[in-house]
Amino acid sequence: MDLGVNIDHIATIRQARGTNYPSVLDAATLAEQAGADSITLHLREDRRHMQDKDLYELKPLLKTKMNLELAPVPEMLKIALDVHPEDVCLVPERREERTTEGGLDLIKKFHDIREISDDLTNAGVRVSLFIAPEIDQIDKAIEMKVPIIELHTGNYADFDGELKNQELKKIQQSVEYAKKAGLLVNAGHGLHYENVQKIAKIDGIHELNIGHAIVAKALFIGWENAVIEMKKIIKEYAQS
């Protein structure tokens, strides 16, 4: 199981003071050296953390691959076609949210999202869709003919007790259903060092995308060590 390291919150720290440090370029390079299988970043419409120039500077630097998260809107499509990352993950976006809340609604916005997805695919960019672990959403992703989905694990991360167990079961069932349909399945959102274990044990997940928890852990043990520790946990539980 691969680890995609999200470096958005390195940029959050930088933007808090409007400085040119900490460097997202250094963060990406060191994360790769520590075992990251890909580098994930989200260029939001409000530019609250990542900036356009970050994409252009990072793309030639990366030794693994860039997984660029974007809202499915024309402005972001234009940027993605110009930067041409290996992967684009289409995500929902609301300006007032702290972070991405929930998955895309592929039922309500099917045609708009499919149009953006098709444009990216035709340009040679691999597309994934960030969706809730729900069968009806997966069916729409299959209908769109995308190769990858990323399952939203936020409810699993937020819930406790029986609700958490129910959400875990939904994720397990969604992975199994999507895999049978030939989709590559990633997962992420809200995962950290204490809750990633049960997700890592799910057979069929290709990659976990994790950022905030790694940045937070790095404050105490260092950036590379934080990546190494997360990678170690995922590897241990994925094989158990």
Regions found by a protein language model. Name each.
Residues 74-83, 134-144, 187, 191-205:
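Catalytic cores of alpha/beta
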Residues 1-3, 60-68, 116-129, 177-187:
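Short beta-strand/loop segments at the ligand-binding rim of alpha/beta enzyme cores
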Residues 35-37, 61-63, 82-88, 122, ...:
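Glycine-enriched alpha-helix->loop->beta-strand junction motifs that scaffold or abut catalytic
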Residues 59, 102, 163-164, 217-239:
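C-terminal helical cap(s) of enzyme catalytic domains, especially alpha/beta-barrels
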Residues 1-69, 73-85, 166:
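Conserved N-terminal beta1-alpha1 strand-loop-helix module at the mouth
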Residues 126-177:
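Histidine/lysine/aspartate-rich catalytic loop segments that bind and position anionic ligands
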Residues 89-97, 148-160, 204-223:
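Glycine-rich phosphate-binding active-site loops on the catalytic face of alpha/beta enzymes
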